[in-house]
From Swiss-Prot:
Component of the tagatose-1,6-bisphosphate aldolase GatYZ that is required for full activity and stability of the Y subunit. Could have a chaperone-like function for the proper and stable folding of GatY. When expressed alone, GatZ does not show any aldolase activity. Is involved in the catabolism of galactitol. PANTHER family: D-TAGATOSE-1,6-BISPHOSPHATE ALDOLASE SUBUNIT GATZ (PTHR32502:SF12), N-ACETYLGALACTOSAMINE PERMEASE II COMPONENT-RELATED (PTHR32502). SUPFAM superfamilies: Aldolase. GO terms for cellular component: plasma membrane. The gene is gatZ. The lineage of its organism: Bacteria, Pseudomonadati, Pseudomonadota, Gammaproteobacteria, Enterobacterales. One of its GO terms (biological process) is phosphoenolpyruvate-dependent sugar phosphotransferase system. Forms a complex with GatY. This is D-tagatose-1,6-bisphosphate aldolase subunit GatZ.
C-alpha cells in the first residue's frame, strides 16, 4: 500500500479497488481477474463480518486469512500479492454495551487482525456506545482511535510494522448500507476533514504514537457517492474540488466507501481527485446474484422439472422465513419485500448465500447446467455481455466461467478508474 500511495502522491494516476466481501466466488473472481497482472489485490473484512468471536461469517481474522489464501492457492495467485485489510475496526459490533466494555473488545479485535497479518487497519471509533452522547465528540473519537492504534502497535512484529498502515475517519452512512431511501448526500467539508486529522494527530502524540502517525495513509470522507435499495447518487467532481485540493497538502489520500454502482468514468475522476482507495462490496455480490438468477432461468428451461434445483424459490423461502438480515432495510408489504429480496442494490441477499439450503440449491443448479450444452441464444437472452465474449473467443459457455465474468464486469470498471 505504501508504494501505491507514494506513486499516487508523486503524480501518477493510480488507485486501488478494495474488495469488501467474504463470498468465495467474489474473492476468487478478484484474484483471478488480476492473476496475470503485476497488481496487488486488496481484500477487506469488516468488524461485524469477521472478529475474535467469529462475526456473522463464523470466521476469526486468522480464519479469514486462511480462507483467502486457500482460494488464492486454488486460483494460482501469489499470497504475497494479497493485501488484507480490516474495515470499521472499533466498537461497531458492541454499540449496545457501555463504552469501557465495547472498547475492551475493540482492542482485542484490532490485536486479532494485526496478529493475523492484516496490514491495512481502519481505526473507526466513531460509533456511540450505550452510555455515550450522540454524536460523539471528535476528540473522543480520536482518543479511542489512538487506543486502538496502540493495541495494533503493541502486537505487531518489526516485520509487520514495516507493512502496517492505518486509515482514520469515517463516512456518513452506517457500515453495511443505507437503511432508508436517499435523495442527496452530505459531502464532507474541508474543515471537518482537517479537524479529523488534527484531533487524531493530537491524540496519537499524547499516547506516544508519533511514529505510528507516519503509517496513517488515508482518511475516510464522503465525496458525494452513495446508494440505497433503488437509487444511486453519482459522483459530481466539481462538488468535491475543495476536498481534492486540501488533501494535496498532506501525505495522505482519501478512502471512499460505498462507491458501488458508479460509472467507470466516475471511478477515474475519483482517483484523479485523490480518492485513491475505492471500496466495493454489494456491487460484486449483486453481479454474482444476477449471474445466478440468469443461470436459474436457463435451468428452468433446460432441465426436467423433477431434477431442477428450485434455486430461486429456495432463496425466497429462506429469506422470508428468516428475515433478520433484510427486514429493517426493505418495505414490509409482501410484493415490495419480494422486489427488495430479489433486486435491491443494497443486496441483502449476500448474507444468505452460506445458508445450507440455498448453498445446496445453487450447487445442484451448477451440476445440472454443467451436464448440458447451454444454447448460445439463451446466453444472449440472459447474459448478453457474456454472449459477446463467447462470440469473440474470450469466454466459454461454462456456468462457473459465466459467473466469474459477470463479476469481472464490475472489476473492469474499477480497473479503468484505478489503472495507471
Amino acid at each position: 500500500m505504501k508504494t501505491l500511495i507514494a506513486r499516487h502522491k508523486a503524480g501518477e494516476h493510480i488507485g486501488i479497488c478494495s474488495v469488501c466481501s467474504a463470498h468465495p466466488l467474489v474473492i476468487e473472481a478478484a484474484l483471478a481477474f488480476d492473476r496475470n497482472s503485476t497488481r496487488k489485490v486488496l481484500i477487506e473484512a469488516t468488524s461485524n463480518q469477521v472478529n475474535q468471536f467469529g462475526g456473522y461469517t463464523g470466521m476469526t481474522p486468522a480464519d479469514f486469512r486462511e480462507f483467502v489464501f486457500a482460494i488464492a492457492d486454488k486460483v494460482g495467485f501469489a499470497r504475497e500479492r494479497i493485501i488484507l485489510g480490516g474495515d470499521h475496526l472499533g466498537p461497531n459490533c458492541w454499540q449496545q454495551e457501555n463504552a469501557d466494555a465495547a472498547m475492551e473488545k475493540s482492542v482485542e479485535l484490532v490485536k486479532a487482525y494485526v496478529r493475523a497479518g492484516f496490514s491495512k487497519i481502519h481505526l473507526d471509533a466513531s460509533m456511540s456506545c450505550a452510555d455515550d452522547s450522540i454524536p460523539l465528540a471528535p476528540e473522543t473519537v480520536a482518543e479511542r482511535a489512538a487506543v486502538l492504534c496502540l493495541a495494533a502497535e503493541s502486537v505487531a512484529t518489526d516485520c509487520q510494522r514495516e507493512q502496517l498502515n492505518y486509515v482514520i475517519g469515517t463516512e456518513v452512512p452506517v457500515p453495511g448500507g443505507e437503511a432508508s431511501a436517499i435523495q442527496s448526500v452530505h459531502i464532507t467539508q474541508v474543515e471537518d476533514a482537517a479537524n479529523t486529522l488534527r484531533t487524531h494527530q493530537k491524540a496519537f502524540i499524547a499516547r506516544g504514537l508519533a511514529e505510528a502517525l507516519t503509517r496513517v495513509i488515508a482518511i475516510v470522507v464522503q465525496p458525494g457517492v452513495e446508494f440505497d435499495h433503488s437509487n444511486i447518487i453519482h459522483y459530481q467532481a466539481q462538488e468535491a474540488q475543495a476536498l481534492a485540493q486540501w488533501i494535496e497538502k498532506t501525505k495522505m489520500v482519501y478512502e471512499a466507501h460505498s462507491t458501488d454502482y458508479q460509472t467507470q468514468t466516475a471511478y477515474r475522476e475519483l482517483v484523479r481527485d485523490h480518492f485513491a482507495i475505492l471500496k466495493v462490496g454489494p456491487a460484486l455480490t449483486f453481479a454474482l446474484r444476477e449471474a445466478i438468477f440468469a443461470l436459474a432461468q436457463i435451468e428452468q428451461e433446460l432441465i426436467a422439472p423433477e431434477n431442477r434445483s428450485r434455486c430461486l424459490a429456495v432463496i425466497e423461502e429462506v429469506m422470508l422465513d428468516e428475515p433478520q438480515y433484510w427486514k429493517k432495510y426493505y418495505r414490509t408489504g409482501f410484493n415490495d419485500s419480494l422486489l427488495g429480496i430479489r433486486y435491491s442494490l443494497s443486496d441483502r441477499i449476500r448474507y444468505y448465500w452460506p445458508h445450507s439450503r440455498i448453498k445446496n440449491s445453487v450447487e445442484t443448479m451448477m451440476v445440472n447446467l454443467e451436464g448440458v450444452d447451454i444454447p448460445l441464444g439463451m446466453i444472449s437472452q440472459y447474459l448478453p455481455k457474456q454472449f459477446e465474449r463467447i462470440q469473440s473467443g474470450e469466454l466459454s459457455a461454462i456456468p462457473h466461467q459465466l459467473i466469474m465474468d459477470k463479476i469481472y464486469d464490475v472489476l473492469r470498471a474499477y480497473r479503468y478508474g484505478c489503472a495507471e
